[in-house]
């Protein structure tokens, strides 16, 4: 009986992992280096590789057009599990359909989406050289009529900017979003602001901005969403002044269209275990990242995609792009 049970267990394991990568996996990131999707994936890949030491992941940054360059590329790759993509939710599932609709070659659900690997609140930051020190002063600034630039590095960041402008009745003629190919160059632009060059304000994930906030290179004015950040107890929530700004940076693992079921299952099984791990929890605490248990499956991720679209597309579609 013991031999039979052992044989059944061995067989079940073999079936569960009938497929695994047999050559290096190319990991496409639609941002410049240092974005939240990249840093979260690198940590998870380290955890997965401890269980699968023969598996190698090679990150390839492919920035441009708010991830459209990367997403167009992944559409053309074989669905054999050796090329994956790390889309940002708001960009790939929502705002590409509004701001990049003329250059994208995919639908939001064209791909084989696997699971969400992490989320991070967005933070409104200011340069230390700015005279704006809090949310009330930022509100006054965006309605003052003076020229103001706000650095954004992705669809979620731009969405938060539009909500701030709408709720705060900011001057559309004076306050402009400045687009960067990812959050890292956006936060660096704020850190480099000197009154003439750089950008005075920015919006990006705190997971990316944290080192510069802690180092005093930029100042955190407020967080999006409803989660208080114990790592930053003195930073208020944007919703305290502008209700409804419930926007997060979020990232997932994605395969090319029509990926085989066993390939999807390998990524879902191994990366969901890594997301739930103690090692990742410690990393998340340090980097201000969280995850949703309900989004650790393809079906759960798809529900989130549809919810995002229902909530934000009607609002964002009303933006007048002719002024840009």
Regions found by a protein language model. Name each.
Residues 22-24, 261-324:
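An extracytoplasmic/periplasmic, membrane-proximal ligand-sensing/linker region
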Residues 106-117, 151, 174-179, 200, ...:
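Short beta-strand->loop
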Residues 1-4:
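Positively charged n-region of N-terminal signal peptides that target proteins for export
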Residues 38-46, 158-162, 232, 281, ...:
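Short, surface-exposed alpha-helical segments at coil->helix boundaries
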Residues 21-22, 50, 73-83, 97-185, ...:
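Hinge/capping helix and adjacent helix->loop/strand transition within the periplasmic-binding protein
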Residues 18-109, 146, 155-157, 167-203, ...:
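N-terminal (or domain-start) structured segment
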